[in-house]
């Protein structure tokens, strides 16, 4: 295992009674193109997952509808029986249609079916963390979906409940009903999304409020699309200049910026490349000074990056 030390903030973060290093791995890139079907080289995908463990990463974020079922199966093939300290998190509330499009699946019966998919393909008896992905267009009341996860936790299928694509009022509503250990919303230096971005809504599109709320309450915040989409240096050109200063890549600086933003931040960058995986993990050692942060943020008052922690 690599040395687990971080230049910004604590080296680990708690999710309920679980503690993990503050960079994880997102498994969305494991399947083939468009997050559909087998990857071109399944053996390479399994090698990458074993490298995740070698580095010291102990948090993997996945979902049964990645593939569908492909990410989960590759994780199990590569890593089962799992290390005792590995935390696997999944998401419920979505599904894939035959035309490869994404759709909501938030009814209690759909959530239960998704949980069973995860348990079977990951070869688990209980899932450590399950995010309820709230898609406003699903037509299913948020509380009804949440109650379904609470029931599955009481049955021993889920260890901890988390949320995804939610507003601050929804987090507050959930906390009034059950403990919440994490929130997974879109957050990155460029504010860009991707194929799932359309499932957000206006409240979620102001992520600073949710992040600050989570930080104040000790709830882990998992930024999905932590490197935006495409060339992150084109999204925020100052990243290239700061990267040259630190002998790093723009993507590494973008991850360091997230870690500097809040001690609650747990980035989960995904990749199908071992080289990029190593780079992402090494980003934890980059210390951005105040000049770096101002350059990245553009000096804009109220920019989310302007409020950082050391």
Question: Can you say where each PLM-predicted feature lies in the sequence?
Answer:
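Conserved, mostly hydrophobic/aromatic
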Residues: 25, 45, 52, 60, ...
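Active-site groove signature of glycoside hydrolases
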Residues: 119-138
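Active-site mouth loops of central-metabolism enzymes
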Residues: 29-43, 98-109, 138
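Acidic (Asp/Glu)-rich catalytic clusters
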Residues: 17-19, 54, 76-87, 119-123, ...
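Beta/alpha (TIM)-barrel catalytic core signal, keyed to glycine-rich beta->alpha loops juxtaposed to Asp/Glu
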Residues: 3-7, 136-310
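N-terminal binding-site loop/beta-alpha segment at the start of enzyme catalytic domains
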Residues: 1-86, 229
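A short acidic, helix-capping loop that chelates divalent metal ions and anchors anionic groups
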Residues: 31-35, 95-102, 191-196, 276-279
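Short, acidic/polar
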Residues: 38-52, 106-122, 167-173, 206
């Amino acid at each position: 295992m690599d040395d687990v030390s971080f230049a910004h903030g604590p080296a680990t973060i708690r999710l309920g009674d679980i503690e993990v290093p503050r960079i994880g791995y997102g498994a969305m890139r494991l399947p083939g193109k468009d997050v559909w079907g087998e990857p071109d080289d399944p053996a390479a995908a399994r090698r990458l997952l074993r490298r995740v463990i070698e580095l010291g990463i102990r948090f993997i974020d996945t979902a049964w509808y990645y593939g569908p079922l492909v990410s989960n199966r590759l994780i199990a093939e590569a890593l089962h029986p799992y290390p005792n300290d590995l935390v696997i998190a999944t998401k419920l509330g979505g599904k894939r249609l035959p035309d490869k499009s994404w759709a909501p699946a938030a009814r209690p019966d759909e959530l239960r079916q998704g949980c069973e998919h995860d348990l079977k393909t990951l070869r688990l008896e209980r899932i450590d963390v399950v995010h309820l992905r709230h898609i406003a267009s699903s037509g299913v009341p948020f509380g009804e979906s949440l109650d379904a996860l609470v029931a599955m936790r009481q049955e021993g299928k889920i260890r901890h409940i988390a949320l995804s694509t939610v507003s601050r009022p929804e987090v507050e509503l959930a906390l009034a009903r059950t403990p919440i250990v994490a929130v997974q919303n879109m957050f990155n230096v460029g504010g860009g999304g991707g194929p799932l971005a359309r499932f957000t809504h206006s409240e979620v599109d102001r992520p600073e409020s949710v992040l600050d709320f989570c930080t104040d309450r000790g709830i882990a915040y998992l930024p999905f699309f932590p490197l935006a989409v495409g060339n992150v240096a084109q999204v925020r050109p100052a990243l290239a200049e700061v990267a040259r200063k630190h002998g790093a890549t723009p993507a590494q600086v973008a991850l360091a910026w997230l870690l500097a933003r809040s001690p609650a931040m747990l980035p989960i960058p995904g990749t199908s490349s071992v080289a990029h995986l190593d780079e992402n993990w090494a980003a934890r050692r980059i210390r951005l000074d105040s000049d770096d942060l101002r350059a990245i943020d553009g000096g804009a008052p109220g920019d989310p990056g302007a409020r950082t922690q050391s």
